[in-house]
A protein has these predicted regions:
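Flexible propeptides and autoinhibitory/regulatory segments associated with cysteine proteases
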Residues: 1-52, 355-356
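Non-catalytic, conformational "gating/processing" segments within enzyme and secreted inhibitor domains
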Residues: 24, 64-237, 256-355
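Short loop/turn microsegments at loop-to-beta-strand junctions
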Residues: 25-27, 207, 366-368
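Hydrophobic/aromatic-rich, well-ordered segments within soluble, folded domains that form packed cores
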Residues: 28-46, 147-161, 378
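Extracytoplasmic/secreted cell-surface and envelope-processing proteins
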Residues: 49-53, 148, 232-234, 292-294, ...
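Beta-strand-rich assembly/attachment modules of structural machines
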Residues: 52, 59-62, 67
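Short, cationic low-complexity segments
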Residues: 240-262, 356-361
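C-terminal soluble interaction/assembly domains
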Residues: 332, 338-391
Length: 391
C-alpha cells in the first residue's frame, strides 16, 4: 500500500478518536471502515461538499478517483493473510421512490462492489448481521428510517489468534483497573513473561503482540500503549502526537526509523519515537470486551464536514434536488482475551431531503372511513369499506 495513504488514514483515525474521547467511558473506532463509508459519499459530492470531504479526509479534490482506488486497495490488502479472518463489505439502501444517478450507482458497484437494496429493516439488518458474523443483530431500528431516503453502510470483521497465547491459568480473576475518573473496576488480568517487542519514551510504554500469520500479506499485531502519566490529558497528548505526525506512528508500528529522538524533530514532548526492541517483558493486560455506539456528527463537523449536514444541491451526483447527511453513526465490537482478538465495525451514513418527500397513500384495499366532529371528536358515522357499490 502507498505509505502516504496509510499516514493519511491513520491521521484521520486519531483525529476522530481524540474528538470522541470521554473521561467516563471507553471509546473506539475502526478508522478504515469509517473512511471507506465517507469516501463513498464523497464520490457523490461536488463544490462546497467535495471541498469539505477533501479537508476532513485529507485528499486532493483533483485526486478523488485515486483516493477511491486506494481505499479499496486497503481492503484487498488486508484479506491476504489466510491465518486471519478478515472481511469488508459496502452497501447502499434507498427508498424506491428516491432516484439515484446512474453514473454514481455504477461507480459504487464497480469500485466498491456495493450491495444495492431497498431501504427496509429486514434486508439491511440481515446484511449487517451476516457481514459482522452475528456481532450486531437488529442494529437498525424503524425510527432510524424515518425521513431517510438513502443509507450507506460499510461493515468490517477481523478475528485473529495470538502467535503466543496467554495462559489462562495465569489470569488473575480478581484484579483492579483504574479509570480516567478515578473509579476502580474489577477485571480479569491476563499475564505473561515473554520476549516481545517493547519501546519506552518520555510519554509512554508500548509493547507489540503478534497474531498468527500466513502468506506475504499483512503481518497483524496488537499494540498496547500505556501513557506514563495518569489522566485523560496524557492519553490525548499521545493521540495528538499520532494525528499531527502520523509518520512517527508508522515508524513506531513498523520498526523503522531512528532508535533515539531526533535532534531536528519537534519540541520537547513531541519528539520522534524510539524504535521497538525485542526483550523479555513482564506484561499484565486486562481481558476486555467492548460494544460501543458513537454518534460521529459532532466530531465530523469539527473536522470540517459541517456543510454536508445542511441541505444543498452539492450531492447532485447522487441524486437531483437538495440532499443532506442527517446522521453518521459507528458501532464497534472489540474483544481481547487469552486466545486473541475479535473485532467488528459498522458505519452508517443516513441521508435525507431538505424537504421530506410526500408520503404516498394509495387506497386500493379495505379501509376505515369515519365522519366526525373535529371540535368534540364525536364520530357520526364509521364504516369498513370492503366493497364499493356503484362507482
Amino acid at each position: 500500500m502507498d505509505p502516504a495513504f496509510v499516514d493519511l488514514v491513520n491521521r484521520f483515525g486519531f483525529q476522530l478518536l481524540s474528538l470522541t474521547l470521554d473521561p467516563d467511558k471507553s471509546t473506539g473506532i475502526c478508522a478504515t471502515n469509517i473512511y471507506h463509508c465517507l469516501s463513498m459519499v464523497a464520490a457523490g459530492s461536488k463544490d462546497e461538499n467535495l471541498a469539505a470531504f477533501s479537508q476532513a479526509l485529507g485528499f486532493d479534490v483533483d485526486a478523488l478517483n485515486e483516493t477511491l482506488q486506494r481505499t479499496v486497495k486497503v481492503d484487498t490488502y488486508c484479506k491476504t493473510n489466510s491465518a486471519v479472518e478478515f472481511s469488508a463489505a459496502s452497501s447502499i439502501w434507498h427508498r424506491k421512490d428516491f432516484i439515484l444517478e446512474k453514473a454514481w450507482l455504477e461507480r459504487m458497484q464497480m469500485t466498491f462492489h456495493a450491495t444495492i437494496g431497498p431501504l427496509e429493516l429486514q434486508p439491511i439488518n440481515d446484511f449487517i448481521f451476516r457481514e459482522t458474523k452475528g456481532k450486531f443483530k437488529n442494529l437498525i431500528q424503524s425510527g432510524d428510517l424515518a425521513g431517510t431516503v438513502l443509507m450507506l453502510i460499510t461493515c468490517l470483521y477481523f478475528k485473529a489468534k495470538w502467535q503466543n497465547p496467554f495462559d489462562k491459568m495465569r489470569t488473575v480473576r480478581k484484579s483492579d483497573f483504574h479509570t480516567f475518573n478515578g473509579k476502580i473496576l474489577p477485571c480479569a488480568m491476563m499475564s505473561k513473561v515473554d520476549r516481545m517487542e517493547y519501546v519506552e519514551d518520555e510519554l509512554m510504554q508500548a509493547c507489540f503482540l503478534p497474531y498468527q500469520s500466513e502468506g506475504n500479506g499483512p503481518q497483524w499485531k496488537a499494540a498496547v500503549i500505556l501513557p506514563k502519566q495518569d489522566g485523560i490529558d496524557a492519553m490525548r497528548g499521545i493521540m495528538t502526537k499520532f494525528s499531527e505526525r502520523p509518520e512517527l506512528l508508522t515508524k513506531l508500528l513498523t520498526g523503522s526509523g531512528p532508535n533515539t529522538p531526533s535532534s531536528s524533530g519537534p519540541p520537547t514532548g513531541q519528539t520522534s519515537m524510539a524504535t521497538s526492541r525485542t526483550q523479555k517483558i513482564n506484561l499484565s493486560l486486562p481481558r476486555f470486551s467492548l460494544q460501543l455506539h458513537l454518534d460521529l456528527k459532532p466530531a465530523l463537523v469539527n473536522l470540517g464536514l459541517g456543510p454536508t449536514f445542511k441541505p444543498s444541491d452539492d450531492f447532485a451526483p447522487i441524486s437531483t434536488g437538495p440532499l443532506m447527511i442527517s446522521r453518521v453513526t459507528h458501532d464497534l465490537f472489540l474483544e481481547v482475551n487469552e486466545g486473541g482478538t475479535e473485532m467488528a465495525a459498522v458505519t452508517v451514513v443516513a441521508m435525507s431531503r431538505s424537504v421530506q418527500l410526500n408520503p404516498v397513500m394509495r387506497v386500493d384495499r379495505p379501509f376505515l372511513f369515519l365522519v366526525f366532529d373535529a371540535v368534540t371528536g364525536l364520530v357520526l358515522c364509521e364504516a369498513v369499506v370492503n366493497t364499493l357499490g356503484r362507482p
